[in-house]
Amino acid sequence: MDSSARSGATGSSNPRAWIVAGVAVAGVLVLAEVARRRRRWLRGKSSPPPYSGAFCDRLELAPPPQPPPPAARQLLPDLTFAVSDNFEIEGYVAGFGNPDWKRTHKAASHTAAAVKTLLKQGATCVGRTVMDELGFGVTGENLHCGTPINPASPSVVPGGSCSGSAVAVSAQLVEFALGTDTTGDLRIPASFCGVLCFRPSQGVVSTLGTLPNSHSLDTIGWLARDPHILSRVGDALLPAAACGLKGKRQLVFADDCFELLKIPNQKTVDVIENAVRTLPYGFQPPKHINIGQYISSNVPSLKEFCEPSTKLQEGKSALKALCTVMLLLQRYEFKANHEDWVNTVKPKLGLEVSTRVLQAVNFTDDNIKSLYIVRTEWRAALKNLLKDTGILVLPTMAGHPLKRNSKQRLSSEFEDKMYAFVSIAALSGSCQATVPLGNHNDHPISISFVAAHGSDKFLLRAILDMYSAIQKQIVLASKLALPPVIDRDVDTSELLKEKGNNSFKRKQWSKAIEFYSGAIKLNDTNATYYCNRAAAYLELGRFKQAEADCDQALLLDKKISGML
């Protein structure tokens, strides 16, 4: 084991011997007190930290001494951090969130590359955190370790899979934390726990020494409360930027994604636009696009994964297809990595994770080549959209988290929206930053910024430049009397109904059925849509379908019987 590693399991933590003589007396006293309190916590002699449940392993890996001049000073002196349970640490077994995994694997012979880098830059690792089993959950609930308590909203789940890392940061147990992000594993808990998150471009930070879920989607990311610490960790882990900024930055808002939210624009889009307007320089006027339609037009190989749709719904269909490709790719690669272990050990898994693992190990790889082609096309298309100075702005999450211990499952509508948002960066391999935006209905909300693959330091710099202005606008937005949120799905379904009615009047029965079906897909609780489609079916002599629609209309609204 590295001489810098000191385990809390033995209770033999020593004072920081690396404090150099030239440090001021006050600084020495502060550091000594920090070290003393940390040792007491590690030995279990002090009361547990608030919001306990974040950690699964308590340990301490201390950094080497600050090098003497002329060597560069460490970037992260005196900062503490934690890592998820899928990071290897020499002499310890990485549990991957599951006791059967821990039981069937040996202690690591090396420490993860990213952890070593952070130690070298002066940070101290104080523990390993709870995560959803095998990196597959999204709620933060773990059958074996329990659910870490969300400091930002204790009555709800913290989000996963890197729940413990987000909770440790939000509860101020550490200054920052590492985790892996495959399909939102860091971005989801960051949003639910109200902390900052950075998911770097895929392949930019070494994943050596981490347990893989899906190797072409996995990235090592980090969480922090302070944007300066978020940026400093980036300076430590990311390669040096190739060149400086070549022009003013431009925010590109994904309007169709924000239309899927039930949060007022005054608390999301307007906050960011107003913040950027107050900045003296550095940003062009923002642009607004329909990202779904852009994907539909610029990722040709995605068409085989799209459901049949009207022209009006093409964008939504493309977004759903993008997240389908992401999830299929994850299943294929998880199966390649872990099928033998799953079939041999037959691990005990929580219900949600068990379902996802079974989907992965039972996956058939008929169209694998197409998945990778879509990924390549989407990365190129997003790069073409954003170029060197563009930043895509989109929601992080689709809504509020589930209640703790409610035994509810996420609705398919919630999952579809959530995965659509996270797939934009995940499948393109682009970098994404998540920034808290205060609260809505007593739950944390956030917004995300995506830059092209490789533009990581550019994006971190932009977040630093915007952050203070965003905080001021959050305060102003919280004081506004906001109108009720319009459900845009209802608006769209009514528009489709009217298009169906117009087609019916023109005796275009098949076209009318297509529009009514689109309205039903968006809102399947409106009896009128079924009645109208039944009338069109009758005109075509499709009596069985007409009868089925009439029956459904009656189930939804008994009063409608007089119309049938």
Residue ranges and their predicted role:
Residues 2-6, 18-22, 41-52, 176, ...:
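Structural helix-boundary/capping segments
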Residues 2-3, 20, 160, 474-564:
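Alpha-helical tetratricopeptide repeat
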Residues 2-175, 380, 384:
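Gly/Ser-rich catalytic/binding loops embedded in alpha/beta enzyme cores
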Residues 6-20, 33-35, 81, 87, ...:
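Gly/Ser-rich, acidic/histidine-flanked active-site/gating loops
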Residues 124, 175-176, 221, 391:
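Short, Asp-centered acidic motifs that coordinate Mg2+ and/or phosphate
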Residues 78-99, 303-374, 436-443:
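Short helix-loop capping/hinge segments that flank enzyme active sites or metal/cofactor-binding pockets
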Residues 370, 401-419:
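Short, surface-exposed loop/helix-turn segments at secondary-structure junctions
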